[in-house]
Design a protein with these regions (language model features):
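Hydrophobic transmembrane alpha-helices
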Residues: 2-56, 60-68
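Lipid-exposed faces of alpha-helical membrane segments in multi-pass integral membrane proteins
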Residues: 21, 25, 29-32, 67, ...
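Interfacial aromatic-anchored transmembrane helix boundaries in multi-pass membrane proteins
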Residues: 31-44, 67-102
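Core segments of alpha-helical transmembrane spans in multipass integral membrane proteins
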Residues: 60, 85-95, 155, 159, ...
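Structural signal for the C-terminal ends of transmembrane alpha-helices
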Residues: 55-58, 95-104, 170-178
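Membrane-embedded alpha-helical hairpins and interfacial helices in multi-pass inner-membrane proteins
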Residues: 82-83, 105-184
Length: 184
């Protein structure tokens, strides 16, 4: 192996390590912002972050997503509610992955907040699944559980819509930073 090949491999390893550390920091950032914003029930930046990271890092955006989910479990305790986080947040990642990568900006400015709001609106129903299984709810009881939390889901949707307006500008900034840093 030549010296140039060794240097090239070393640079590639450094780049991958930097990217992994950066994605880990993003997961911690998600968790920290959720704690700071906890005074506002169901209003947070998590959906926005997941969408921005997915647009910029594609499948690697699952790293900060699951770091966030794991930190939530450690901080608040691993309970029935936490099980839903294992699929509810990655669902937003999956929906974002399915969106066209090259949407016109005007379309993206409308689509991203709507997707974020929709995810916030259905979040309670997604969380009802493990609750219904764990507590042996009937279908009617599950619907009642969802209905009881609907006001929180509407709040979640409104917050997600507002923060969803930042998805496109922040993803453009992140792409520019990635391009200029040459480390990611």
């Amino acid at each position: 192996m030549t010296e140039n090949e060794r240097r090239s491999r070393a640079r590639e390893r450094s780049r991958k390590l930097f990217e992994l550390v950066l994605l880990t920091v993003f997961g911690v950032l998600m968790f920290a912002t959720k704690i700071v914003m906890a005074v506002l029930p169901n209003v947070h930046l998590i959906g926005m972050f997941i969408m921005v990271f997915t647009i910029s890092f594609r499948s690697k955006a699952l790293i900060p997503t699951y770091i966030y989910v794991i930190l939530e479990g450690f901080y608040f305790g691993f309970n029935v509610w936490w099980v839903a986080y294992l699929y509810a947040w990655p669902l937003l990642w999956a929906i974002t992955m399915l969106l066209p990568r090259r949407m016109p900006r005007k379309v993206a400015m409308a689509v991203y907040p709507v997707v974020a709001a929709f995810h916030g609106l259905i979040f309670g129903a997604l969380c009802a699944i493990p609750q219904a299984i764990a507590y042996n709810f009937s279908f009617e009881e599950t619907l009642a559980w969802i209905a009881a939390g609907l006001s929180f889901d509407v709040t979640h949707a409104v917050g997600n819509f507002c923060f969803g307006l930042l998805v496109l500008p922040l993803s453009l900034v992140l792409e520019k930073l990635k391009k200029n840093s040459r480390l990611v």
